[in-house]
Amino acid sequence: MYLLDTNIVSMLDQRRHAHAPELIAWMKRNGGSLCLSVMTITEMDAGVLKLRREGKPDRADQIAGLVTAILTDFADRVLAVDLETARHVARLGELTHRQAVELPDLVIAATAARHGLILLTRNMSGFSRLGVPARDPFVDLPTDV
């Protein structure tokens, strides 16, 4: 099973489908094996709020609609931060304290580790130092699950 990083989930936006048709088709075929971290929802909601603050209500509404659809599609596969995950975040933060890894990436990596998932991300350099199995589906699309 896989955990989708926010930069992969963002490809579900209709405006980005043309950039990743193989990935979108793979995600549709393997949807039941894909999970999200609550941090992805946090990042997407923050993006909606930023767009509104910047006076881009139409784009904000599009992304808000995408978040709603994602929450429906992934209802039972949005993984919360439990105590074990939170403690793993702290350990990863200490491991990378000199590398300034952002908290959202630490939470997503810890969530993948906690649940034994492979992280799908475009940010291989950011996650490779965290010791979490990860792959870039634009370079190496997984086989169907």
Model-identified regions with their sequence ranges:
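Alpha-helix capping/helix-boundary segments
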Residues: 8, 40, 85, 107-108, ...
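Short, well-structured N-terminal submotif of metal-dependent ribonuclease cores
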Residues: 1-40, 50-68, 129, 143-145
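Acidic-residue sensor for enzyme active/binding pockets
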Residues: 43
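Active-site neighborhoods of divalent-metal-dependent phosphate/nucleic-acid chemistry enzymes
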Residues: 46-52, 72-120
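Acidic, PIN/NYN-like endoribonuclease modules and their adjacent C-terminal/linker elements
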Residues: 1, 109, 113-145
